[in-house]
């Protein structure tokens, strides 16, 4: 009688093994100084972050600005005219972007519960902490963050970057220029400007009598240069382009 046999089996895919070995990379935030900025490694991404815009942001926050910049100060008065607002470095602004990208996946997609829990933990860690690592049980990672799930997670982050590049630079034509998301206790606004993406985090206080109140005195904000995300996104035909195509964008940043 003929019988089924497993005499010949191909070896386990080595590439898949190498991906499995690096699943913990989503729980590590590696920041190293580089010429003119920093290199950040998270997941399977390597970001090259220039120290672009920091001087300009601080200058706009001072009272000694040229008249042409007053429009920018007025538009973002809660950032530049607010003595209690705080400027954060570009790598921290990027960290917030990544946290929002994960949160976007958590809120919009039907994820299996275990995987959803991991995405939630990672997004909260990126958004609320500045530590270089978060401990997630290896067993939990092994069960719920498989190689395929890891790929889905990274692809979701890239899709969020693509969504950001569909924004128009702040303009006077009424075209969308910001992505906003409300989380527990905070509101995050990502706005496309000439130099890249302005990231602001506002604290929200919820009072029984009045509902939500945005506490602008506790705003933190930073700037991520466009080139940082450009290399990790795909430009589609018809998407808005950057500064050189925006003759009507009169903002200083």
Swiss-Prot record:
Signal peptide: none annotated. The gene is VP24. Belongs to the filoviridae membrane-associated protein VP24 family. Monomer or homotetramer (Potential). Interacts with the nucleoprotein. One of its GO terms (biological process) is viral process. Keywords: Host cell membrane, Host membrane, Membrane, Viral matrix protein, Virion. It is found in: Virion membrane; Host cell membrane; Host endomembrane system. This is Membrane-associated protein VP24. It comes from the Viruses. InterPro entries: Filo_VP24. It is a peripheral membrane protein. It comes from Lake Victoria marburgvirus (strain Angola/2005) (MARV). GO terms for molecular function: structural constituent of virion. May act as a minor matrix protein that plays a role in assembly of viral nucleocapsid and virion budding. Unlike Ebola VP24, mVP24 has no measurable impact of host dendritic cell function. GO terms for cellular component: host cell endomembrane system; host cell plasma membrane; membrane; virion membrane.
């Amino acid at each position: 009688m003929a019988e089924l046999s497993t005499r010949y089996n191909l070896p386990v895919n080595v590439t898949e093994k190498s991906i499995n070995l690096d699943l913990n990379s989503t729980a590590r935030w590696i920041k190293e100084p580089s010429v003119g900025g920093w290199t950040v490694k998270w997941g399977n991404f390597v970001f090259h972050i220039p120290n672009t815009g920091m001087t300009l942001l601080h200058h706009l926050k001072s009272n000694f600005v040229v008249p042409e910049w007053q429009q920018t100060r007025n538009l973002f008065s809660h950032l530049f005219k607010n003595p209690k607002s705080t400027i954060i470095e570009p790598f921290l602004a990027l960290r917030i972007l990544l946290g929002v990208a994960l949160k976007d996946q958590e809120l919009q997609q039907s994820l299996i519960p275990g995987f959803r829990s991991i995405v939630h933990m990672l997004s909260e860690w990126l958004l609320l902490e500045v530590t270089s690592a978060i401990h997630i049980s290896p067993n939990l990672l092994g069960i719920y963050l498989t190689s395929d799930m890891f790929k889905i997670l990274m692809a979701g982050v890239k899709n969020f970057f693509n969504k950001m590049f569909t924004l128009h630079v702040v303009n006077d034509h009424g075209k969308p220029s910001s992505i906003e998301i409300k989380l527990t206790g905070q509101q995050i606004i990502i706005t496309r400007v000439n130099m890249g993406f302005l990231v602001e985090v506002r604290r929200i206080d919820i009072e029984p009598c009045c509902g939500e109140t945005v506490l602008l005195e506790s705003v933190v904000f930073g700037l991520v240069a466009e080139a940082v995300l450009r290399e990790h996104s795909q430009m589609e035909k018809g998407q808005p382009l950057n500064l050189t195509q925006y003759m009507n964008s009169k903002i200083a940043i």
